[in-house]
Amino acid sequence: MRIYYDFKKDIGFNFLIYKEDYLDKIGKRFNLINEIEINDSEFDKVFIIKSNDESLVKKVLCKSIKEFLIMNRMYLANFKLDKEKNTTVLNLNAPFDENNLTHMEDVLSFMKKTIDIIVGFNTKTNANNKQA
């Protein structure tokens, strides 16, 4: 299942979070993978994080977001914020059970919280740029 949100503009920030696999472990061993670590040993051990803004991705990965991703790591294909054409889209790709309404509510709540965090950062960034 793919759940996505279109921000209707390019917000200039992107990230990709996905479950670390065997090939990633080899790549990390030989310094072939450039990843961001967030100083959370459980999360860093399970996921690969890539972004164009390390400090912002660390802010997005608040406790509740990390907990959701850890809890659903068996299902997660990837979670990304990326530019598509002239807009930025937040995607959550995972084989969720759409018949489990409680789980779907949790997924939608997770997406809303992530969107609110990103919109909040983007609003602050735009306000700071106007003052400069």
Task: Give residue ranges: language-model regions.
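Charged, low-complexity intrinsically disordered regions
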Residues: R2-A132
